Amino acid sequence: MSDSNKEKKKKFADMVSKRKGDDQEDQQTGDLSEELNILKERAVQLEDHLRRAVADNENVKRIMQKQISDASDYAVTKFARDMIDSCDNLKKAMENLKDGDPIHEGIKVAHQKIVSDLKKHGIEEIDPIGNSFDSNLHQAVVEREDNEKEPGTIVEVLQTGYTIKNRLLRPAMVILSKKSADCESN
């Protein structure tokens, strides 16, 4: 064979070899590109999981802070119930004593002090006279005929109700107005 043929064969072999190398490179590039896409998808999934975990953590933290705050605010509930029973007893004692009696005045001062101290801790009396009945705050005991008031208006409080930080501690026991039978038939 002549040198030129050998050269041509060599060039041809080099060209075939180069194409095989290019094909292998293309295959490797395709494989790497596919692997990169898989890794990108996985990174997006992990980022989403991380975001959710952080949000869940924040929610748990917020809930725990609320529970701690509520526990602090309402820790005195049992004690407050005992104190409002004492207030009721002092009121009953004052009702049975005459105004101006020194004992009456002493009980009145003690009652006012207890009510004042309860207010300092977020415990407030419910004063519903003249308001419409609200089953969330009041307990109706009886209805009384009263044609001057709208039916369902609170006309008397039998037992004072209390709230603690806007949560019901004890409902007010009340008497409601109703129209007389004579007015209803007219």
UniProtKB/Swiss-Prot annotation:
One of its GO terms (molecular function) is protein homodimerization activity. Residues 1-35 are annotated as: Disordered. InterPro entries: GrpE, GrpE_coiled_coil, GrpE_head. Residues 1-22 have a biased composition (Basic and acidic residues). The keyword Disulfide bond does not apply. It is found in: Cytoplasm. Gene3D superfamilies: 3.90.20.20, Head domain of nucleotide exchange factor GrpE. The keyword Cell membrane does not apply. Keywords: Chaperone, Cytoplasm, Stress response. Homodimer. Participates actively in the response to hyperosmotic and heat shock by preventing the aggregation of stress-denatured proteins, in association with DnaK and GrpE. It is the nucleotide exchange factor for DnaK and may function as a thermosensor. Unfolded proteins bind initially to DnaJ; upon interaction with the DnaJ-bound protein, DnaK hydrolyzes its bound ATP, resulting in the formation of a stable complex. GrpE releases ADP from DnaK; ATP binding to DnaK triggers the release of the substrate protein, thus completing the reaction cycle. Belongs to the GrpE family. PANTHER family: GRPE PROTEIN, GRPE PROTEIN HOMOLOG, MITOCHONDRIAL. This is Protein GrpE. It comes from Wolbachia pipientis subsp. Culex pipiens (strain wPip). The lineage of its organism: Bacteria, Pseudomonadati, Pseudomonadota, Alphaproteobacteria, Rickettsiales.
